[in-house]
């Protein structure tokens, strides 16, 4: 199983640097200690290789978990690349949501594509999110890597895995719509974003045609 193999290699080869662990420890001491901690990883932006799970689906599952286990006091750590998701979860769980000061996006462009952000900062943010998720007492995750890696970092972490309910998207990757376009996030400046999406797809089609043309003329 991939997860078992991942846990084996993480335990054997991955050693997190002390200054990263200190940042994790400081955040955890401030927001997640002395109460039941729930980790949530939810992808937005350009996520497209599987059907995205909506915030409403997460929230319903979280309430069910709390009710089933009679949990009254808890804190929720949210790891996400989409700014709008923070607003949704804070509205549903006021005063209980924490999140690391990571790079996030307000649209369909994933933060790791941001050219004006230092690449080390991008990587550090994701690593800290993974470590904080792994230190929670229960995890809700979708079909994306960060939540999965949290399970590799902590083999005893219990979770609800929406990936088991999420269909893999078929067809050419460059033509798929990302989660930002598929999930209802309120006003997105829809016309401008639709034009941006069409332009993005058109550019990718041109790149594919160019590659085919160059291959045929080698």
Please identify what each model-predicted range represents.
Residues 41-45, 69-119:
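Catalytic donor nucleotide-activated moiety binding site of glycosyltransferases and closely related
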Residues 38, 73-76, 97, 136-139, ...:
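Hydrophobic beta-strand segments of well-ordered beta-sheets in folded domains
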Residues 171-218:
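Membrane-proximal basic amphipathic "stem/tether" segments
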Residues 1-73, 207:
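Secretory-pathway luminal glycosyltransferase catalytic domains
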């Amino acid at each position: 199983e991939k997860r078992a193999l991942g846990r084996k290699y993480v335990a054997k080869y991955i050693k997190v640097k002390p200054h990263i662990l200190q940042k994790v420890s400081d955040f955890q001491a401030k927001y997640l200690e002395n109460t039941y901690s729930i980790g949530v990883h939810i992808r937005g932006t350009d996520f497209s290789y599987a059907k995205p799970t909506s915030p409403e689906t997460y929230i319903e599952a979280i309430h069910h978990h709390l009710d089933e286990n009679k949990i009254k006091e808890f804190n929720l750590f949210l790891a996400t690349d989409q700014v709008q998701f923070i607003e949704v979860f804070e509205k549903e769980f006021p005063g209980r949501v924490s999140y690391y000061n990571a790079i996030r996006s307000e649209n369909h462009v994933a933060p790791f594509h941001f050219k004006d952000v230092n690449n080390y900062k991008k990587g550090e943010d994701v690593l800290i999110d993974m470590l904080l998720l792994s230190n929670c007492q229960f995890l809700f995750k979708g079909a994306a890597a960060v939540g999965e890696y949290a399970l590799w970092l902590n083999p005893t972490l219990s979770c609800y895995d929406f990936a088991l309910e999420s269909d893999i998207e078929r067809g050419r990757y460059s033509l798929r719509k990302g989660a930002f376009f598929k999930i209802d996030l309120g006003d997105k400046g829809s016309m401008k974003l639709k034009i941006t999406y069409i332009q993005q797809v058109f550019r990718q089609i041109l790149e594919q045609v160019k590659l085919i043309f160059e291959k045929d003329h080698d």
